[in-house]
Design a protein with these regions (language model features):
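Amphipathic, Lys/Arg-enriched alpha-helical "gate/interface" segment within cytosolic domains
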Residues: 2-153
C-alpha cells in the first residue's frame, strides 16, 4: 500500500461533501476521516455526500466494523443532517454486496449505489433540490458539466 495515499475530503461545493478513497487505507487514515466527518455532522447543516470508492480494492473486517460502529454511534446526527449519500462502486460484485448490506441494515439516511461520478452527482443534486436547496443543486450540476445548455434565438 502506498503510504502517501489517503482518504481525501472536498467540501468546496458545500453542501456537497465529496470523499475519495485510495485503493487501500490504514486504520489511522480511517480514524482521521471519521474525525473530520464528525466535525461536519456536528455543524448541524444539511448536506449530501458522494463517496468515491472506484479505486478501493478492499477493506479489512476491522475497518468495516469501525465504519458500522461510527454510523450507529452517530445515527441521530446522520438522520438530522445527511440528505443522503451516493457511493460510487464500479465493481458489479461490490455493488451487489453493498445493496444487500443496505437492505439488511438500512442506513440512517438515503443511500444510492452509483456506477459513475455523473450518476452520483445527478442523484446528489436531486437530493439537494428535494430539500429546497436549488442554488447549491444548480452549482453542483454546473461544476460537473451536467446542466443542459440553454438555446437562444
Amino acid at each position: 500500500m502506498d503510504p502517501s495515499a489517503s482518504i481525501t475530503i472536498d467540501d468546496s461545493l458545500w453542501p456537497l461533501l465529496q470523499v475519495r478513497f485510495p485503493s487501500a487505507f490504514t486504520n489511522s487514515q480511517q480514524e482521521q476521516y471519521l474525525s473530520r466527518l464528525l466535525t461536519y455532522l456536528r455543524r448541524g447543516e444539511r448536506y449530501v455526500g458522494i463517496l468515491d470508492t472506484h479505486l478501493l480494492k478492499n477493506t479489512t473486517s476491522e475497518q468495516r466494523q469501525r465504519q458500522a460502529d461510527f454510523i450507529k454511534e452517530h445515527e441521530a446526527l446522520f438522520r438530522s443532517c445527511s440528505l443522503g449519500t451516493a457511493g460510487i462502486i464500479t465493481s458489479p460484485l461490490m455493488a451487489l454486496g453493498a445493496r444487500i448490506l443496505i437492505h439488511l441494515k438500512p442506513m440512517p439516511s438515503p443511500y444510492y449505489v452509483a456506477s459513475s461520478l455523473p450518476a452520483a452527482v445527478t442523484w446528489a443534486a436531486e437530493r439537494l433540490e428535494l430539500a429546497g436547496l436549488f442554488g447549491p443543486a444548480e452549482r453542483v450540476r454546473r461544476h460537473f458539466g451536467l446542466l443542459a445548455e440553454r438555446r437562444t434565438g
